[in-house]
């Protein structure tokens, strides 16, 4: 039926496509794309290194539950720009996301959820949060805010994309 060379070619082709198209190179992003909200009135330009670190830290620390900007435990609340802006308080800037990673609250802001959501405050129960620095949280927040610019329909778009 199919010979060994056929399957080898298929595997090599798949690996090539995966490596070539696996993501956007941080150095290739222009300054405008790397500009995100620092707080409600100021913006900041992430460095290519912050972009890379933020993605790596997000994937290793948050990606289990938030792969692709979704929330596995509550598919109604994602990490897309609209959901972050509509949260109470809004979580659509670096400072507010860092605050959330330190002391998370429910989407409507009515109750603290550090006992069920990983955070710096609950690092004893969620060991992946234990060694994160302020700089790490900043870079993770930057990744969350940058991702909708890079993957506009996929980030937070749900399982139809992943």
Swiss-Prot record:
Subcellular location: Plastid, Cyanelle thylakoid membrane
Signal peptide: 1-26
Binding site residues for heme c: 62, 65-66, 117
Gene3D superfamilies on file: Cytochrome c-like domain
BP term (GO), one: photosynthesis, light reaction
Cofactor-binding details, from the entry: Binds 1 heme c group covalently per subunit.
GO cellular component annotations of the record: cyanelle thylakoid membrane; photosystem II
Family matches, as Pfam families: Cytochrom_C550
One of the record's GO molecular function terms: electron transfer activity
Entry keyword annotation includes Thylakoid: yes
Keywords: Cyanelle, Electron transport, Heme, Iron, Membrane, Metal-binding, Photosynthesis, Photosystem II, Plastid, Signal, Thylakoid, Transport
SUPFAM superfamilies xrefs: Cytochrome c
Required cofactor(s): heme c
Membrane topology, from the record: Peripheral membrane protein
PROSITE patterns noted in UniProt: CYTC
Coiled coil location: none
Keyword Iron (UniProt): yes
Family, as annotated: Belongs to the cytochrome c family. PsbV subfamily.
Subunit (UniProt): PSII is composed of 1 copy each of membrane proteins PsbA, PsbB, PsbC, PsbD, PsbE, PsbF, PsbH, PsbI, PsbJ, PsbK, PsbL, PsbM, PsbT, PsbX, PsbY, PsbZ, Psb30/Ycf12, at least 3 peripheral proteins of the oxygen-evolving complex and a large number of cofactors. It forms dimeric complexes.
Function in brief: One of the extrinsic, lumenal subunits of photosystem II (PSII). PSII is a light-driven water plastoquinone oxidoreductase, using light energy to abstract electrons from H(2)O, generating a proton gradient subsequently used for ATP formation. The extrinsic proteins stabilize the structure of photosystem II oxygen-evolving complex (OEC), the ion environment of oxygen evolution and protect the OEC against heat-induced inactivation.
Protein name: Photosystem II extrinsic protein V
Originating species: Cyanophora paradoxa
Lineage of the organism: Eukaryota, Glaucocystophyceae, Cyanophoraceae, Cyanophora
Name of encoding gene: psbV
